[in-house]
Amino acid sequence: MNKELLLGVNIDHIATIRQARGTRYPDPVQAAMDAEEAGADGITLHMREDLRHIQARDVRLIKQVLQTRMNLELAVTEAMLDFAEEISPEHSCLVPEKREELTTEGGLDILTHRNVVEKAVRRLQLMGSEVSLFIDPDKEQIRAAVDVGAPVIELHTGCYADATSEEKQHYELQRIKEAAEFAASLNLVVNAGHGLHYHNVKPIAAIRELNELNIGHAIIARALFCGLKEAVRHMRQLMQEARLYVND
């Protein structure tokens, strides 16, 4: 029997809409509660250093009201680690960050920044947080994740999602499959996310080694037309359908 694939709903772009006008609405706290009610297994928030969407207040309030769990994405900086220390998130994910990017453009380079990443992992673990590293589907980066003591990785699916041809998409899917298999063989918990939407999620969801998908922009965009709860339910349905037909 195939294990259930979890869905983490990223609600950053609820805050993006709010910050565009500097209003008090729409409220990410309400979005988190609605996503949970619709079946989300967790809520993911990326509090960027430039505070372009999620604010510290959002994180504090959501931490108080969640019935599931919060996954806090953060850059490897003193300011963000200090904030995480205050919040003590159940789950945290270290991600690369550039101020000029529209969205996260690639995975964390553990090989280049090993000492800094290792210290951050240890610090978060001392807070009681389960630490994940957002990395490209690359075996050397996966080995490095093990070396710095992270129990969880999240594979960056952006190249797969952005592929402009079937050949390129197939190539990127194979990279993710092989990376997931390799990581699982090293006893890592393997999650995935970035750029996944309703038309490309099934091949990723069918990868048996994956534990959780983190999806945000596509769900929030669909919610504009059908409501957030229905958007979450539909994504869960597609993921479940993909898992149903994976051979044991």
Swiss-Prot record:
<comment type="pathway">
    <text>Cofactor biosynthesis; pyridoxine 5'-phosphate biosynthesis; pyridoxine 5'-phosphate from D-erythrose 4-phosphate: step 5/5.</text>
</comment>
<comment type="similarity">
    <text>Belongs to the PNP synthase family.</text>
</comment>
<dbReference type="InterPro" id="IPR013785">
    <property type="entry name" value="Aldolase_TIM"/>
</dbReference>
<feature type="binding site">
    <location>
        <position position="195"/>
    </location>
    <ligand>
        <name>3-amino-2-oxopropyl phosphate</name>
    </ligand>
</feature>
<feature type="binding site">
    <location>
        <begin position="12"/>
        <end position="13"/>
    </location>
    <ligand>
        <name>1-deoxy-D-xylulose 5-phosphate</name>
    </ligand>
</feature>
<feature type="site" description="Transition state stabilizer">
    <location>
        <position position="154"/>
    </location>
</feature>
<feature type="binding site">
    <location>
        <position position="53"/>
    </location>
    <ligand>
        <name>1-deoxy-D-xylulose 5-phosphate</name>
    </ligand>
</feature>
<comment type="subunit">
    <text>Homooctamer; tetramer of dimers.</text>
</comment>
<feature type="binding site">
    <location>
        <begin position="216"/>
        <end position="217"/>
    </location>
    <ligand>
        <name>3-amino-2-oxopropyl phosphate</name>
    </ligand>
</feature>
<keyword id="KW-0963">Cytoplasm</keyword>
<protein>
    <recommendedName>
        <fullName>Pyridoxine 5'-phosphate synthase</fullName>
        <ecNumber>2.6.99.2</ecNumber>
    </recommendedName>
</protein>
<comment type="function">
    <text>Catalyzes the complicated ring closure reaction between the two acyclic compounds 1-deoxy-D-xylulose-5-phosphate (DXP) and 3-amino-2-oxopropyl phosphate (1-amino-acetone-3-phosphate or AAP) to form pyridoxine 5'-phosphate (PNP) and inorganic phosphate.</text>
</comment>
<dbReference type="GO" id="GO:0005829">
    <property type="term" value="C:cytosol"/>
</dbReference>
<feature type="binding site">
    <location>
        <position position="103"/>
    </location>
    <ligand>
        <name>1-deoxy-D-xylulose 5-phosphate</name>
    </ligand>
</feature>
<feature type="binding site">
    <location>
        <position position="21"/>
    </location>
    <ligand>
        <name>3-amino-2-oxopropyl phosphate</name>
    </ligand>
</feature>
<dbReference type="GO" id="GO:0008615">
    <property type="term" value="P:pyridoxine biosynthetic process"/>
</dbReference>
<keyword id="KW-0664">Pyridoxine biosynthesis</keyword>
<dbReference type="Pfam" id="PF03740">
    <property type="entry name" value="PdxJ"/>
</dbReference>
<feature type="active site" description="Proton acceptor">
    <location>
        <position position="73"/>
    </location>
</feature>
<feature type="active site" description="Proton acceptor">
    <location>
        <position position="46"/>
    </location>
</feature>
<keyword id="KW-0808">Transferase</keyword>
<feature type="active site" description="Proton donor">
    <location>
        <position position="194"/>
    </location>
</feature>
<dbReference type="InterPro" id="IPR036130">
    <property type="entry name" value="Pyridoxine-5'_phos_synth"/>
</dbReference>
<feature type="binding site">
    <location>
        <position position="10"/>
    </location>
    <ligand>
        <name>3-amino-2-oxopropyl phosphate</name>
    </ligand>
</feature>
<dbReference type="GO" id="GO:0033856">
    <property type="term" value="F:pyridoxine 5'-phosphate synthase activity"/>
</dbReference>
<feature type="binding site">
    <location>
        <position position="48"/>
    </location>
    <ligand>
        <name>1-deoxy-D-xylulose 5-phosphate</name>
    </ligand>
</feature>
<dbReference type="InterPro" id="IPR004569">
    <property type="entry name" value="PyrdxlP_synth_PdxJ"/>
</dbReference>
